[in-house]
Amino acid sequence: MSNSIIIIPSRLAATRLPQKPLIKINNKTLIMHVYEKAIQSQIGEVYVATCDEEIASEVSNNGGKFIMTDINHTNGTDRVFEASQKLNLKDIDFIMNIQGDEPMINPLDIKNLNKLSKEKSLNISTLAYNIEKNEDYDNENIVKVITKNKISDNSISEALNFHRVIKEDSYDNIYQHFGIYLFKYSALKKFVNLKKSKNEIKERLEQLRAIDNNMKIDVLLANYFSSGIDTKKDLEEYINLLNK
């Protein structure tokens, strides 16, 4: 059976929500909310990849593992790859990248993505969910994925494109994309060695580098809602959700 590892990229230099990973939510920092969800999935070891000593200390002080990475990375996937190189992973075939601002991600969805991707030997896979509100189509902080076919429980479809803003009726199969990817190690290595594509730069979405270079991304439907924390409004909504 092939083995997996989870690496969570995280840094302090967020423009929309300063010091985001260290914001306390119900007496726990955002990065530790994400770390604990990853641990609960039980698919493999979990590390935080960061260039900031403050994040490293927070993770370490709470019993977690971290890897220090270069400050100059412009996206999470490059940071994840550097961490994987430093870990010298000899027995790991799959590397999961969970973005450090996805505290709502459900451990069961993490586990299901890992299980189905391994069974079908997918090179790159990710999760999506049905869009819940019409205004989400215009919200650039909620990334949308267009799939080739409709996805339902345990079905998989190829991602055709990703957008930050899109018209609701422009395509048949539009879903909310989650900040999580499972890579075969070989696919991750190929991805980080590709040049940034024009669409990637235009949309500020690193996954478009794969699409633009004919690297297939398979999309699975998540069973539970999740949304990244990018703004103060996102943060307030997450706190309200926890306190219900």
List PLM regions with ranges:
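Conserved core of the sugar-phosphate nucleotidyltransferase
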Residues: 106-197
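Short phosphate-binding loop-to-helix
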Residues: 47, 53-112
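Conserved alpha/beta core of the MobA/IspD/sugar-nucleotide pyrophosphorylase nucleotidyltransferase superfamily
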Residues: 172-244
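Short, acidic/turn-prone active-site loops that include or flank metal/cofactor-
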Residues: 12, 70-76, 224-226
